[in-house]
């Protein structure tokens, strides 16, 4: 058993496969995800886990060099993202999901609580 950090094996594997500039997303429970994109579904019930809980667990595990959020994203979601942010329409964000390596589905019920992250490098 792992001693610390992420425990979900699918999530650990997906993160380990990321390369520089690969994109991935953290999404609310209602975001339509393209069929061909891997979904790592962490949602248990509405509101659990929250976007913030998932993002806080991910931050020590990944290197991020940029992010994309939709125009309607709440300010609290923007404040959680510790990198340069590009703001696009919600439709453009949904279109960009098609290029993501995977999407992490949370139990978040806040509208537009969706962020696409661009992987950086640790060196």
From Swiss-Prot:
Location within or outside the cell: Cytoplasm
Pathway where this protein functions: Carbohydrate metabolism; D-ribose degradation; D-ribose 5-phosphate from beta-D-ribopyranose: step 1/2
EC number: 5.4.99.62
Reactions mediated catalytically: beta-D-ribopyranose = beta-D-ribofuranose
Superkingdom, taxonomy of origin: Bacteria
Residue positions of the active site: 20 (proton donor)
GO cellular component, one term: cytosol
Main location: cytoplasm
GO MF term set: D-ribose pyranase activity; intramolecular lyase activity; monosaccharide binding
Gene Ontology biological process terms in this record: D-ribose catabolic process
InterPro entries associated with the record: D-ribose_pyranase, RbsD-like_sf, RbsD_FucU
Sequence positions that bind substrate: 28, 90, 112-114
Keywords tagged on the record: Carbohydrate metabolism, Cytoplasm, Isomerase
Claim: Isomerase is one of the keywords in the record: yes
Annotated family: Belongs to the RbsD / FucU family. RbsD subfamily.
Task performed by this protein: Catalyzes the interconversion of beta-pyran and beta-furan forms of D-ribose.
Quaternary context: Homodecamer.
Name of this protein: D-ribose pyranase
């Amino acid at each position: 058993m792992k001693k610390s950090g992420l425990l979900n094996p699918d999530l650990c594997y997906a993160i380990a496969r990321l390369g520089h500039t690969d994109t991935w997303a953290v999404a609310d429970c209602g975001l339509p995800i393209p069929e061909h994109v891997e979904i790592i579904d962490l949602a248990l019930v509405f509101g659990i886990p929250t976007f913030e809980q998932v993002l806080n667990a991910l931050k020590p595990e990944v290197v991020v060099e940029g992010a994309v959020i939709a125009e309607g994203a709440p300010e609290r979601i923007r404040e959680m993202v510790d990198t340069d942010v590009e703001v696009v329409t919600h439709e453009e964000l949904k279109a960009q999901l098609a290029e993501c390596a995977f999407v992490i589905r949370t139990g978040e019920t806040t509208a537009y609580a969706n962020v696409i992250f661009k992987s950086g490098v640790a060196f």
